[in-house]
């Protein structure tokens, strides 16, 4: 009788150890992928804000870099053009507003660059652990912005 109970306990403990190892690997990989994606987007924003140059090659490189780390992410690059308007309340004064623009390849000084990253779907290991044990991490969802300097 004791041998049977010990075998059951041994199988349960082995199963728990394997699951904990998979959970640890998933969390470690996810966190490393998130840090790498944030670093890529930060480098992209810094480069564009410093040089005010963006072409299709830069955009393709950003898409490829963000997709290379594991999580399937959607990258949106938004441009807000700086507009100086006369102030109707005080003649002679002006105020600034920002208007969304579809043209992301031509930049002026003072324009805002906004890069939004959202996760489209989980990785295979993450979906397995969620379906079996309910372990889940918050999806990748962040936005970085910068103002064009030159």
Give the label of every model feature segment.
Residues 2-63:
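Alpha-helical assembly-interface signal, strongest on the long, hydrophobic N-terminal helix that forms
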Residues 53-150:
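Short, conserved structural patches
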């Amino acid at each position: 009788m004791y041998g049977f109970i010990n075998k059951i306990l041994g199988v349960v403990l082995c199963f728990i150890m394997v699951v904990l190892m998979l959970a640890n690997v998933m969390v470690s990989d996810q966190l490393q992928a998130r840090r790498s994606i944030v670093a890529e987007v930060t480098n992209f924003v810094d480069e564009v804000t410093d040089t005010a140059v963006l072409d299709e090659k830069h955009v393709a490189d950003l898409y490829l870099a963000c997709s290379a780390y594991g999580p399937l992410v959607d990258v949106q690059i938004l441009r807000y053009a700086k507009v100086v308007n006369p102030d109707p309340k005080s003649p002679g004064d002006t105020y600034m507003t920002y208007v969304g623009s579809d043209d992301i390849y031509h930049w002026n000084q003072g324009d805002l660059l906004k890069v939004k990253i959202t996760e489209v779907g989980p990785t295979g290991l993450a979906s397995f652990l969620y379906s079996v044990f309910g372990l889940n991490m918050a999806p990748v969802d962040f936005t970085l912005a910068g103002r064009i300097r030159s």
